[in-house]
A protein has these predicted regions:
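Early transmembrane hairpin of solute transport permeases
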Residues: 11-101, 107
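Alpha-helical support elements that line or immediately flank enzyme active sites
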Residues: 7-23, 249-266
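Signature of multi-pass transmembrane helix bundles
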Residues: 89-235
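Short, small-residue-biased leader/transition segments that mark boundaries at the very start
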Residues: 2-4
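Hydrophobic, membrane-inserted alpha-helices
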Residues: 37, 279-283
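Hydrophobic, small-residue-rich transmembrane alpha-helices and their short perimembrane loops
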Residues: 228, 232-250, 284-292
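Hydrophobic alpha-helical bundle architecture
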Residues: 17-20, 260-273, 283-298
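Generic structural signal for well-ordered, non-membrane alpha-helical segments
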Residues: 7-10, 14, 46, 50, ...
Length: 298
């Protein structure tokens, strides 16, 4: 799995370190856990038309605002992207693996000028700062009091609870789940109109769907789900509804259900309850996978 959220978390950590430095960094050192490094290295960064960690790091330093959290690059402009490209070309960024750590989600950033240094560390959660320092002065040093395993196990879900809730909960209390259908289907339909990522969904919807895979509900499920993921992974400015913090998991939990329901004439209530069952099942499974898996969560 490659994840935009991981790239943006790196940009957030860079922004915090740069803000703490109080000046435009001359050098930026980024140390990442293996999972973050692998997940973030090949995804599109929204609003830039570019792929990879260097542009996320550069923009985090140049225009990032840590107060925006995972919208840290909200103020990105074409001019900022050009400045970021120059920052990269000047070889001011060094990205490497953080050795000898067990934390799957770990981001350490050191920003430097000629006479100042600032460090920020995110660990355990994509917006969880555990350490901030400027020069030799520690500004934040917060060790996690709850292990990842304990935190993930806390809801105590099981499949019977998930199933019973999805089938018996008052309809008006779970109607909000239709927002996942609206947003994620719109993302797929937008992807069909353009060329995003590998354009797998668009390709499946064309000749391959009709002549190779067959024009069936199953091929339609594949094309819609792939198209929405194409747009998201390419960094398109298209909103999707996530599940457990993952856009791809949200798409995968939503679009197969939506396409099947539409093509089989299911009622709105059946769609709502099926979507709720699907999304809660993903959350139940995610408890066992942990916060950040090295494999694709979808």
């Amino acid at each position: 799995q490659m994840c935009i959220r991981d790239s943006i978390a790196v940009a957030l950590c860079v922004a915090k370190a740069a803000e703490t430095l109080g000046a435009k960094p001359e050098k930026i050192e980024v140390l990442l856990s293996a999972n973050i490094l692998k997940n973030a290295m090949g995804v599109g960064i929204p609003g830039t038309g570019m792929v990879g960690l260097p542009i996320a790091v550069a923009l985090g330093a140049l225009i990032g605002k840590s107060d925006y959290q995972l919208e840290v690059l909200r103020d990105c402009t074409s001019e900022a992207v050009e400045q970021g490209k120059l920052f990269i070309a000047e070889k001011r960024i060094c990205i490497s693996l953080k050795e000898d750590i067990t934390e799957k989600l770990y981001i350490e950033v050191i920003c430097k000028t000629e006479d100042k240094t600032a460090k920020a560390i995110i660990a355990g959660g994509h917006t969880t700062f555990i350490y901030i320092a400027k020069n030799e002065q520690t500004l934040l040093d917060k060790q996690q009091t709850v292990s990842e395993e304990e935190e993930e196990a806390s809801p105590e879900l099981n499949l019977r609870k998930v199933y019973d809730f999805a089938l018996t909960a008052p309809l008006d209390e779970i109607r909000f789940i239709l927002d996942t259908a609206r947003l994620n289907k719109a993302a797929a339909e937008q992807a069909f109109k353009g060329n995003y990522g590998h354009s797998l969904g668009k390709m499946l919807r064309g000749t391959y769907e009709h002549k190779v895979m067959g024009d069936s509900v199953f091929s339609h499920i594949l094309s819609y789900t792939s198209a929405a993921c194409d747009a998201r992974m390419a960094g398109a400015m298209i909103p999707v509804m996530s599940n457990s913090g993952s856009g791809n998991q949200g798409i995968s939990a939503t679009l197969p259900v939506v396409v099947f329901a539409e093509e089989n004439g299911k009622s709105e209530e059946e769609l709502i309850r099926a979507l709720m069952l699907s999304h809660l099942t993903v959350i139940y499974i995610k408890q066992s996978l942990g916060r950040l898996s090295a494999l694709c969560g979808c």
